[in-house]
Every structure is written in C-alpha cells, then in structure tokens.
Amino acid sequence: MIDDLIYFSNDAVTSTVLLNVGQEVIAVVEENKVSNGLKAIRVEAVSDKWEDDSKNSSKGLSDSSPRVLIGCVTSMLEGAGYISQTTYFSLESVCEGFHPCKGDWVEAEYWIRPGTWSSEAISVKPLRYKRVDKVCISSLCGRNGVIEDSIFFSLDSLKLPEGYIPRRHDIVNAVVVESSQSCYIWRALCMTPVKRDATLGEAPQEPYGALLLKNKGDIEVTRMTSFGTLKEGESKSIVIWIENKGKFSRELVSCRLANWDKAHQFRFETQGRSKSCPGAAAGSVPEGENVNSLNHHREDKTDEIPESRLANSTEISPDGCACKEESREKGNTPEKQEPEPGGLIPPGEKTHIVVTCSAKNPGRCKELLLLCFSDFLIGRHLEVSVVSSEEALIAVREPFSWKKPKSSQTLVSAKTTVVVTTQKRNSRRQLPSFLPQYPIPDRLKKCVEQKIDILTFQPLLAELLNMSNYKEKFSTLLWLEEIHAEIELKEYNMSRVVLKRKGDLLVLEVPGLAESRPSLYAGDKLILKSQEYNGHVIEYIGYVMEIHEEDVTLKLNPGFEQMYNFEPMDVEFTYNRTTSRRCHYALEQVIHLGVKVLFPEEIILQSPQVTGNWSLAQDTKNDGQSITNITRNDGQSMTKVTRNDSQSITNIIRNDGQSITNVTRNDGQPITKVTRNNSQSITNITRNDGQPITKNKKTVKDQTKHTTEERHVGTTDQPEKASSTAETMDEIQIPKARDKEFFNPVLNENQKLAVRRILSGDCRPLPYILFGPPGTGKTVTIIEAVLQVHYALPDSRILVCAPSNSAADLVCLRLHESKVPKPAAMVRVNATCRFEETIIDAIKPYCRDGEDIWRASRFRIIITTCSSAGLFYQIGVRVGYFTHVFVDEAGQASEPECLIPLGLISDINGQIVLAGDPMQLGPVIKSRLAMAYGLNVSMLERLMSRPAYLRDENAFGACGAYNPLLVTKLVKNYRSHSALLALPSRLFYHRELEVCADPKVVTSLLGWEKLPRKGFPLIFHGVRGNEAREGRSPSWFSPAEAVQVMRYCCLLARSVSSQVSSKDIGVITPYRKQVEKIKILLRNVDLTDIKVGSVEEFQGQEYLVIVISTVRSNEDRFEDDRYFLGFLSNSKRFNVAITRPKALLIILGNPHVLVRDPCFGALLEYSVSNGVYTGCDLPPELQALQK
C-alpha cells in the first residue's frame, strides 16, 4: 500500500531497486469504477541520491544514471525530434556540428521522466560517421543528390561553404553519417568542393519561376488562364489580353509555347493567324483521331533526344531575336521556325491571343505560354484537367467516411460460451505436446494502450541486440506486434449483422476483407454474440473454414447452425497466436546455437562433408573463387580462421605471397604455413614439425586434367591417391571420394560454386548465405544444393522452409519437376487449416503424405513454411534432428519466424543455408514500435551487416566482394532487358548485375509503336490525376491512372506489330482500391487474364510486361513526404516492382509527387535523360534534364 490508500502489485513496480516500508515512490494511479478504490499501475522508487549537476537536476529525472539508447530518428519537429518513435530529444542535447534528420542512426543517453513515464534523451550523437575525400557527385535532382552512387544528401540539411552550389560531377570532400535514406545507408552532413569552378557562386537560373510570371515594362497580361475541366475530345478557347499601360510603344516579338505538354493539347492564334506549338505541327495527330490511341508518341529514332527546351530569359540576344527553338520531327531534318512577330502595341492600346485547348491527355496538365518582347519575357501558365469517359465506370460511389462502427456495449450480468463440438483439427494429426501460451504481459499491454513509453517496461529495447538480451528483446517485440494486431482487429468488430446460409454452413460477409481489412485466414477463430431479453449473452465460438472475396464460411456448433433463424449477431474477431507462440518457443530452443551462430565473429573450419571429383565434362572452368585462392588485394591479414580438427588448413593466399599466421586449430597452434609460388600452383603444406604432409601441384595450364577435387574457399585441397603415404593417411582422414555431377548442368559458375560450398559445409554451423538478386536463379541453386546433399550424404535429413505457402510450393514443384528424388524421399507439410483447393495438383501427392506429422518426420526431404515447421516441436522433435535446414526467401521472414526451423538443427555439425535478397521485401510488420526496435529486420539482413559477412572489395574482390566461406552472390540476371536492369543494378547491387536473358524474349517489344524511343523498352507516363477514397475503405485510387493502365493493356494485347498475351502482362499497384478499379476496367474490355495486385503478390514472379500505377497525386501535402507517399517510399518495394518485367516496363504516376522520393526520383531522372518520359508537364527540377 502507498500512504495506506493506494493498492499496488509487484507487476506495477518498474524500478530495479527493492522497495522498503517508508520509502518514497512516484506512482501513476487509476480509479476502479466499481469500488471507487485507487490502484497504482506504475510505481517507481525515488533515489536517495541526486546528481549535483544542475543540468540533470533541473530536468527532474528519477534515475541518477542515464541509460544508452541505440536507435533511428523517426521524426523531426521544430527544435526537437523523436528516436525510435517514443524517446524525445531537443536540438540542444545534440552534439556540436550534428543536425539530425529523419532516418539518422544515433547513440543517445536518456532518462525516464517520473511524472510522465516518458523517455528523454540528454545527449545525442551519430552512431557512425566518417570522412570521404575526393568523391564525385553522381546524381543531382532538385534538392536531393547522391555521391558515388552510395551517399545521399539533401540541400535542405547539407552544410556548405558560403557561395558554393553543388553540381553534378563535382569532386568534393564530405563528412557522412549512418542514415537510412531510402536505398542509401549514408547521408552527407557537410560537403566542400575540392576545386572550385570559375562559375562558383552563381545561383542557378530558374527561367520559369515567379519572376517570369510578373508583368513587366508597363505591359499587363490576363492572369485567368485556366481551362477548367474538359472531357477528353472536347475543345475550349480563352482570350488572353495584352495591354500597354506605359508611355512608349512595346513590340511583341513573338509568342510561343514552352512545349511542356507532350500531348500538344494547346495551340494559339495571334492577330488573325494560327500558330501551333513549334515542333508539334508535323508530329502531332489530328484532333479527330481515336482518343484511345494514348498520347500519339513520336516515332523517334533510338539516338534522338526529346524536343529542345526553351532558353531562359537571360538568353535574349541584344538584337531582339529572342526565344529561338529547334524542333524535331519524325525522322526529318530539324528546321528552325521563327515565331511570327506580334507587332507593336501603342501606349494605351491592347491586343489579344486566342488559346485553344483540345483535351487529349487524361489528368491535370500545365503548359507555359511565353510572350517575348524585345527586352523581357512574360509567361502565363495554361492549365487544364481532362477527364475520360471511362472514368465514369470507376467514379466514387459513396463518400469516404472512416468512422468506426459502434459496437454494442451492453453491460451484462452473465454469459454462456458455446464452442464447436466437432473435431476442429485434422483427425490424422496427433499432436500430444502443445506449446505454452506465452501470454502478453498486462503491463506491456497497458503501456501500448495508454501510450506510456515502452522503455519504462523493457529498457533492453534500447540496447543493440546481443546474446544476453536476445530472448527478452524479441519476446517483447513479438508481443508488441500481437498487441497491435489485436487492437487493429477490434476496429473491425461488427454489430447486428445477419449471417447467410450456404448448405449446412453459415456465411458472414465482411466488408473490406478483400483489402485485408481485417486480415483473416482459414482456421482463425471468431466469436458471435447473441443477447437474450434478460440481458444474458450467449457466445458462439466459430472457425473460418473458407474465404472467398468478402464472404467467410464459418464452422459453428451444429445445434446453432440448425437453429439459426437470421437473427442479428455481434461479431468479434480474434488474433491467431499460433505462429507467435511458435516463435516464442523457438527463442527458447535456439539459445543452444549461441554466439557462434547468432552473432558469428570467428570462422572455425570443419572437415568437409563430401569430397571427390566433379565431372570435368560439366565443370571445366576455374573461376578463381575456389578454396584454392582466397586473396586480399591490400595485403592485410584476413579474418581469424580456425580449424577444429587435425587436418591441414586450406590454401589461403594473399597478394603479397606471404603466409597467413592467424590460421589455427582449436588448441591455438598454427596448422600450416601457406605460401604461393610463381606458377600459381597449390603450394606445399607443412605440418608443425616442418615435414611435408603432401605435395599437390596444380598449375593453371593443367587445371582441366587434374583428378583431385577442386575444393572451395575455406577447405583443404585433397592430396592425390598416388602420392598419399601412410603417414599422410594417419594425419588426415579423407572421406571416401566419389565422382559427382550436377543434376542441372546449365548452372553458371557462381551457382555451381555455391552448391559446392553448401555441400562441403566448411563453416557449419555458421549460416551460409546465398545472396540472390532478382532473376539470378536463386531457387534453382537451392534445388540443386538440396539434391546434392540428399544423394551425397545418405545420413542427411533436410528441412526446406519458406515464409509463405507459395514459396514453399514452388520449391516442392521444382524438386518434383527435376524427377530426381524418389516419391518416398520427399514430403510437403501444410498447416492444419490449409484447404486442398489452394494446392496445385502436381504437389498434392506429397501433401497427402504430410498430413500425418509423425510419418512426415521420417522423410529425408521435408518442405514446409517456417511457421508450420513448429509442428515438429509438438511431436517431440528436438535439437539435432535435421542435419540441414534451408530457408528460401529468408529475407521475408522475421528473425523469430526464421528461428522456428533453426531450433531443430545441431549446433555442432548442422548446416544452415539462408537464401534471399536483403534488398527486396522484408517481413510484414505492422506495429510501428516493433519496427522501430528491429522486428522488421530479417535474420538474413542482420547477419549480412555483421563484420564476418560484410561486403569488402579490398579483401574479397576476386570472390564477388564477400567472404566466400559465408556468402555467394549471384550476379547473372536471366530475366530483364539491359535498359530495365541498369537502374536497379546501380541503386541496389553495386552495378554488378550481368545481362544473361534470352535476347529473343527481352527484345521482343523493342519495335512497339507506342515506345517514346525505339529500342528502349521503358515508358514513364506522367499523370497528374486526382486521388480519391470511397465508403469505409481507407485505400486510395486514381481514376485517371486506372484508365491509362487499361489503355496500355489494350494496346499491348491488341497490337498488330507486337501482340502480347494478356497472361504475360502484370499490373502492380500499392493500393487495394486501385486494384479493384483496374479490374473493373479490364473486365469491361475482356482482359480478365491480366494479373493485378500489390507488390507483395508479385515477389518471386516475372512477366513479359509490367505496368505500375503509383496512385498518389496530391501535390499539396508535403509536410512529411515519406508518410504521405506511404507504400511508395519503401525502397525494397520499389526494387521488387521494377525488377519484375522481362521486355517492357511502364510506370504511371505524378512526377511532381514522386520526385520527392530518392528511388522514384532516380527513375524519373533515368527516364527523362533517356527520352522515354511522356505525359504531363515535369516538375521544375527535372525540366532542365530535357534536351
């Protein structure tokens, strides 16, 4: 009790100090509404000692010793900001010279304020920073730029010398800090040029800025120049008056359009003579042409550039010849067209220009009309909004209203719960060992619900992840995600709904279900409530049997199903905690893996699992990445490598030819002295006593003739049998050799290398990472590795997992199609609630074998999802049961989810293989708190940030820049055209991706008549449409973009020259409502075979043509660009979207919005520079790129 008045329990105590009677405490108290008693929900001891430091004392903080927080700046306010969502800091607490920005990683000292139970940082500094010298500005788009393709900077936060304005290709010195800025991990804090140009200090000219629009020289021009909204195909004219209010005559030298509008919708007449936009007369299409022909693209040659831009006002020549412009027509020699003079305007007189707009391009558009006088320019913006007739099909049907439906809050005195009496689970699955519940702590739930700082409950969240806080930190993050899911589900509870009948079952209609609002799966539990007249409530427990669009088929108590007479019911959704409980259980099991697996630092080489010769007919190429040649370009010593047996270490070579001294056994003694001879041969390997163990020479010339297996990085070259001595055989136990062949002979060198390294398993149990960028054959490599392990190691038992059913099904299908495993060797284990209708026919036989978990556990190749791997815990399977665990698409699984299969492998001799791409989609985490503290970082991504797995071009330049003992990066892309691969390769993969796709496929659409530039299969179509929402759905859609998507699909599917099957076209859009609207339009034109979906639905897939609709188009909300852009600001989502197509990529979006994002800004810059941009006018920062 506190003051004999306030009750509290031990759970409410947050301080680590033991409380004593008489001790002063600070408490947060709530009143019990029933008893009117007071209960403390937070109690913290007041320390007897206070710091003398006035700065700390003035803050009124309760703990005298600050704690350390490692986190990311998640928001910035005026003069302050927040770290990891909840920890406040003021700019006064930031170290000198550092001005933090959103995304910066910082190290802070913080306190907990006792009165508010919130954390406040008292010192903030960058987590990591460095200086880079003589680096080049590789990109500059508006206010954002990039240095050396890897360091982001914004002119809004960059410190520059006075008078210096960065320009592309400048050589600069910079100080950079670690920061998550889209696809970049460094941000420039300050920059200085190495050598200043003569033009330094001149501000960049803005020819179309506010100054241009002002009246000048006593000339006044009409300002009302908007055409309003026009239907596509309509025309409208307006008159622009030009009045001379001065004392002297003014000569209107010429009138012209700046040609921002690529659809050439505007033309003007002056003094009775018609004048069209230069460059448009010959190239434009007559007004009467079909409006469905899009934007009437010019058939430019491949090497031609877009129409030239108008010169700015400083380029007016003294002789009065202003605004000269070249025009370029279809394949014709450009001709200079002089604008006709407008004539003299006497004082007090006025003239006029008639501007006509012929609406062609859906969406908003802006053009610039330039009135060129002898010594100045006056400009006026011509604006129009064009709507198409097809937009009526998808117009807003119901005004948007995001109001939570009121649920019944009737106080009840009693309730009765009725459960399903029939067996819910598959009867053939006997699961005697059930997982613990791992309930969410009440204190944590109150923290979230009452918005109390989470660090008051779990200070460990502020620490970097390590072995000591591993379980507690991830357990807390899992609970945070669960709490968010429960809160989110409550918002979708329904009141007084009537169920429909479907045979003997009942069907519940859930609005918004198709948009995953709420997110339901087969097997989830629902509670249906019925209130009697006496206030008594009966709860019926039901389970989801089937989901079709917005209809949910339920399994309830048979008695209720028969007696139900369409009475209104209240519906309460519940969160399925099965996967979360398996994650909690896995966290307890994987502790045995320890630091060596979860936080690897040193490499301990094991004996190879398999030795022998590979078929020379299949493998005759030495790529320099084998075990026989680990090189360092800088001559530095390598990472510590040890061996835990008596065998000699492998040949590890430095470029300087010196031996490496830190290669030891577990007893710390050196094993070998490894040197290098002039002929590149494998050198002598000596024992500790100086006697030769074996002599095995292999020169470059006779590589194809040697009969000894070429070992991979980190293992020993086995001596030839002919030269083996008894002493050698006693010293080294060589596994029985066998000739081996690849089941898939068309694998490339990197793929074969990865298979060998996995098969050898030199670094087990350290996870081996197969880094597979898009289209590089990652899954093919995994299939080969599984088959090789299965046949080379008869004692192996392999668990192959993936985060999703689709990915696991794909692995099973590919193994089936290989026709290598015997039917009794492989099984596909599904979740209990998965419906057979969702399983493809080819793998159904393997799934039937997986229905009995006991029987399935005896198969040697077991395929399942990461979550369903937890079924094996429930039948008593424990550590060491599986010899090999493969996790495909490991980047999409959260770390606790990935741990579920890893908990079943041996920590001594088990082999872990993680395959995926850390630059593509990660785990789906919805709790912002859980994301802020790292639950959205996959195990694959975290390991690749560890020193042992880091990219190091100096140390491992010959091995793909990664330690070949631990990582193989696949770089040969078999999917996309070179023009489509260039940008993602530069942004995400260090320009290393190689084009290896079938030329017949990727060049099949280079002659399509609608390409802005022939031979370049990319279109960026600018659409300044309107974004909208309707009904109760918070999802956005853009009618103008949806119509344009439909038109492109029609043109592709019905093209005479380059017809594309509708099944070869995919449409990606981030919003469910836009998916729905596009499907309506495609259904209207009989193109229902075209797949339309979110980015997540396309990961791992490829299409001949991809059309992307970005939707967001509100240019007025830029107070928080990333929040406003939503899904679009995720660089991983962007990477997946643009790497799906083989032969053609079409992007539709508003360039004025998208330019704010670094990735989309780079795509816009790439498109404009290559002459493939079309559509609406560009933002000012991109206009200069148009030639």
Curated annotation (Swiss-Prot):
Tissue-level expression: Isoform 1: Specifically expressed in testis. Isoform 1: In testis, present in pachytene spermatocytes but absent in postmeiotic spermatids (at protein level). Isoform 2: Present in cardiomyocytes (at protein level). Isoform 2: Heart specific. Isoform 3: Heart specific and is specifically expressed in cardiac myocytes.
Induction text: Isoform 2: Activated by MEF2C. Isoform 3: Activated by Nkx2-5.
Name assigned to this protein: RNA helicase Mov10l1
Stored Pfam families: AAA_11, AAA_12, MOV-10_beta-barrel
Enzyme class, first EC level, given as a word: hydrolase
Sequence repeat intervals: 642-652, 653-663, 664-674, 675-685, 686-696
Gene this protein is translated from: Mov10l1
CC annotations in GO: cytosol; P granule; pi-body
Biased composition (Basic and acidic residues): 296-307, 322-339, 699-720
InterPro entries: DNA2/NAM7-like_C (IPR041679), DNA2/NAM7_AAA_11 (IPR041677), MOV-10-like_beta-barrel (IPR049080), P-loop_NTPase (IPR027417), SF1_C_Upf1 (IPR047187)
SUPFAM superfamilies in the cross-refs: P-loop containing nucleoside triphosphate hydrolases
Subunit structure: Interacts with PIWIL1. Interacts with PIWIL2. Interacts with PIWIL4. Interacts with HSPA2. Interacts with PLD6.
Similarity comment: Belongs to the DNA2/NAM7 helicase family. SDE3 subfamily.
Any GO BP annotation: male meiosis I
Record: residues binding ATP: G772, P773, P774, G775, T776, G777, K778, T779
